[in-house]
Amino acid sequence: MTRSEGDTWNLASSVGATATMVAAARAAATRRPRPVLTDEYAEPLVRAVGLDVFTKLASGELDPDDLERDVGFARMVDTFAARGRFYDDYFAAAGKAGLRQVVIVASGLDARPYRLSWPAGTTVYEIDQPEVIAFKTATLSRIGAAPTAELRTIGIDLRQDWPAALQDAGFDAAQPTAWLAEGVLIGFLPPEAEVRLLDSITPLSAEGSRFAADYGSLNDASQASTEQARRTTEGWRRRGLDMDIAALTYPGKHTDVAAHLGADGWATTTFGLADLFAAAGLPELTEAEQGPAATLSFVRAIKS
């Protein structure tokens, strides 16, 4: 189903299913002999969602290589593991720099407030759809998980007035903040909503604040991109999942996040997926393994 203004979803459908896919990949990565990252909460969260293909991937019943070949997403598990590690390292560096206020927008099924070692005095704000926040909180509570920082959750759509909700939850704009928008600015918001998101973050960011995100579009409407999306959609359907990446992304020219932040006084550094693989100690992507994710950019920024 094509995206529309004000549409809704859950973790088993539409764009929400991609959050479950990423969590399943983190669970699979955690099972490896020398894991790039460790997320012990990913598997129980994926099981609770109940999508069969992702439950099997998370639990080890499904060979990741077989799935990646079938859906046409080479090195999928490595890709999401490297991305997760990139942002985990970003938060570690922010903590060492003295930042004690964190905002994760569209947090999905990642349990960073539970699985990372935060410095004493850190407050983490998580923003996502109300149903996603409620589901994750309830599931983690059932398995006895406890946050490793002060956690404040805000259930709201990013297309609504989330800055007001964030401040109502106690966010202090006078304190430097470490922001994260993982897997958000890659076509899952309308282009104008991407700009609003960035333009809302900057005035809430004191000097020394940091920002990290991936950006671009998983479907640029080119013939090659459209054909790749078709093959991937057919692969997921063979696995019993109706997930059409092309239909999940909004059309239009998406935002060059690094350039936009740079114009607003942020010092930015950009990376490619190959940089993330190298930093994680993973074998580099071959030419045959280059897919839509390899076209995305990654940015870290500091507010001056």
Swiss-Prot record:
Keywords: Methyltransferase, S-adenosyl-L-methionine, Transferase. It holds the Pfam family LCM. GO terms for biological process: methylation. The keyword Cell membrane does not apply. It comes from the Bacteria. It is an enzyme of class 2 (transferase). Exhibits S-adenosyl-L-methionine-dependent methyltransferase activity. This is Putative S-adenosyl-L-methionine-dependent methyltransferase MAV_1058.
